[in-house]
């Protein structure tokens, strides 16, 4: 099953810089939010990353800032991860700024949950506690009554994501916080206006949400490159099916727990895995040697 939105038919919305936005899969926002390239044909080449993997390389050059961007998307055999590498370069003799946010388009359901561990959330000039605001858990889609977004402040881990129990699907994004600090979600809301906006984009019967990862903590900040400077970052998307809300995730595993049980799902093939579960006192509660397969 698709974990990202794929509307049918595709109906561009007039909310982009050039007046055309589609809620489809992943959007690489550069050099600003909902970038000018979304509905434009882009230079694209296939390349061989080695070891049986397949790769696509996309290049975007911004005429205003002069910053050159390359996005590499890689799929590797024996795993269910989508790898992306971003390379930003400033070839000009002056300092220039840009933003980068990876934007995943998601079909929204009432119980869909934003999986994030943060101290606070930020919206324009307003800071709120997180995850509870006025007694409501704002991570859960049904509690976002109108169009709104939230940026995680002081996120505590290298991963975040989402999961929908209604669709039994979700995903986590994994990247080093030293490279990518931003963790954000946006919802059109589940009121009449929000559902109407989703229908206009070809998503019928559900709402629409976005889960975004950025270089900086909010979209009010720009990263700057000195003359000849460059910036490289790596990120991974890990799809989840029939799993639940994630408690922890890496590029190898995702973990969820409920009273009396732990569940583990793998992103890669493991022929002979030696696993141990320990308690808070360090005592080993259970050990097992098993084979794991993606999913």
What are these regions (language model features)?
Residues 1, 58-109, 234-235, 257:
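Acidic, contiguous internal or C-terminal segments within carbohydrate-active enzymes
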Residues 2-9, 80, 91-230:
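A contiguous, surface-exposed recognition patch within enzymatic or periplasmic domains that forms
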Residues 90-93, 241, 266-269:
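Short, acidic/polar linear motifs in exposed loop/turn regions
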Residues 93-100, 246-247, 272-276:
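Short, hydrophobic/aromatic beta-strand segments
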Residues 239-250:
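Short, Lys/Arg- and Gly-enriched loop/turn segments at beta-strand edges
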């Amino acid at each position: 099953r698709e974990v990202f939105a794929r509307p049918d038919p595709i109906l561009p919305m007039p909310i982009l810089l050039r007046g055309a936005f589609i809620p489809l899969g992943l959007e690489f926002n550069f050099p600003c939010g909902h970038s000018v390239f979304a509905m434009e044909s882009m230079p694209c080449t296939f390349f061989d990353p080695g070891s049986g993997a397949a790769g696509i390389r996309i290049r975007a050059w911004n005429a205003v800032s002069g910053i050159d961007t390359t996005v590499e998307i890689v799929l590797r055999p024996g795993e269910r991860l989508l790898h992306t590498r971003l390379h930003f370069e400033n070839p000009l003799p002056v300092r220039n700024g840009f933003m980068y946010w990876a934007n995943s388009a998601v079909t929204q359901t009432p119980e869909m949950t934003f999986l994030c561990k943060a101290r606070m959330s930020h919206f324009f000039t307003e800071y709120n506690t997180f995850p509870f605001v006025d007694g409501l858990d704002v991570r859960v889609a049904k509690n976002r009554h109108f169009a709104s977004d939230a940026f995680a402040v002081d996120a505590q881990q290298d991963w975040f994501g989402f999961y929908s129990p209604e669709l039994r699907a979700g995903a986590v994004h994994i990247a080093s916080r030293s490279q990518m600090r931003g963790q954000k979600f946006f919802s059109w809301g589940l009121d009449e206006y929000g559902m109407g906006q989703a229908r206009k984009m070809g998503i019928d019967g559900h709402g629409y949400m976005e889960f975004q990862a950025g270089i900086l903590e909010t979209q009010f900040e720009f990263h700057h490159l000195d003359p000849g400077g460059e910036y490289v970052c790596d990120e991974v998307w890990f799809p989840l099916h029939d799993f639940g809300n994630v408690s922890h995730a890496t590029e190898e595993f995702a973990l969820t727990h409920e009273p009396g049980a732990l569940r583990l799902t793998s992103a890669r093939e493991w022929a002979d895995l030696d696993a141990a579960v320990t308690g808070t006192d360090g005592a080993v509660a259970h050990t097992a040697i098993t084979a794991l397969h993606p999913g």
